[in-house]
Amino acid sequence: MNRIEDQARELFSPLGPTYDRVGAALSLGQDPRWRRYLVSRLSRGGHVLDVATGTGLVAAELRRRGFDVTGVDKSPEMLAIAERRFGGGVPLIRASADALPLDPASFDHLTFTYLLRYVVDPAATLVELARVVRPGGFVASLEFGVPSGAAGPLWSLYVGGVLPLAGRVLRNGWREVGDFLGGSIRDFWRRHPLDRQLAWWHGAGLSGVEVTRLSLGGAVVIWGRKA
């Protein structure tokens, strides 16, 4: 496990059962809507691999929309919560996104959420994710964004002031998340602006790549089709 993955696991594993409820609250109720939009980018039907599945929120939405789902995550703590959520109804695999123990072209589609900020080589990871998708299938991602224009100062105030303060009030690991998240998002987009990220997608063999910014740019959904 690399240092970045270590940091991510140390941050999020202690959140446990509070992750879903408090995470939605800290996004001002937007996170569930973002996840629904992510899933809506896929064509209907088929078997979806949900990478960085966490507690299974995206996987649950995929099932609700009629997909078969397999979840992958590096954290045993998060997978334990997902297992309780699904009661064995969704296969769950503990694995790293950059080394999936899966055959090429073994899934119809693939989703991933809040992943590329935590890997050493995002471009190589995206190649590995696309490897397991059948030609014609979709890959879709959800990541936090950095709003521009009039929304930018409000976002900076929220992630720089409100989130850390809320984390201190909530405790149980949320203090560290509140302190970390804003800087992590800002640094990712500074190092990897959208044009660079789109180059990763094209380099992974994905075509027709599209981008939608949600909630004034607070979230970014990217999706494309495996050539």
What does each model-found stretch correspond to?
Residues 205-227:
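Core SAM-dependent methyltransferase catalytic element
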Residues 6, 146-200, 210:
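C-terminal alpha-helical "lid/dimerization" subdomain adjacent to the S-adenosyl-L-methionine
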Residues 1-43, 57-61, 78-81, 178-183:
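Conserved class I S-adenosyl-L-methionine
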Residues 123-135:
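A short glycine-rich, Lys/Arg-flanked "PGG" loop and its adjoining helix->strand segment in the class I
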Residues 47-99:
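Class I SAM-dependent methyltransferase SAM/SAH-binding core
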Residues 98-110:
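A short acidic, Gly/Pro-enriched loop at the edge of an enzyme's catalytic core
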Residues 108-122:
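A short SAM/SAH-binding and catalytic strip from SAM-dependent methyltransferases
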Residues 136-144:
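Conserved beta-strand signature within the Rossmann-like core of class I S-adenosyl-L-methionine
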